[in-house]
Amino acid sequence: MMKPLRQQNRQIISYIPRVEPAPPEHAIKMDTFRDVWILRGKYVAFVLTRESFQRSPAFSVPESAQRWANQVRQENEIAD
């Protein structure tokens, strides 16, 4: 007799994908900068453009990450 492929009474977990690359749960938001998060010891900016986030490269100083975010906002003409 073959075993069933999955446990019969186990609930199926529904997965809702996030809009990537959104700031992950373990990222720490910097209060002094609008778009800058601390991620693995580096500074990363996340900018919401239309329906998706754009993620910056990792910077060693938060000002650089914010400058990148400001440029992306200007390029996409995001209104506040």
From Swiss-Prot:
Keyword NAD recorded: no
GO biological process: cell division
GO molecular function: DNA binding
HAMAP family: CedA (MF_01580)
Stated role: Activates the cell division inhibited by chromosomal DNA over-replication.
Protein's UniProt name: Cell division activator CedA
Pfam families: CedA (PF10729)
Organism: Salmonella typhimurium (strain LT2 / SGSC1412 / ATCC 700720)
Gene3D superfamilies reported for this sequence: Cell division activator CedA
Keywords carried by this UniProt record: Cell cycle, Cell division, DNA-binding
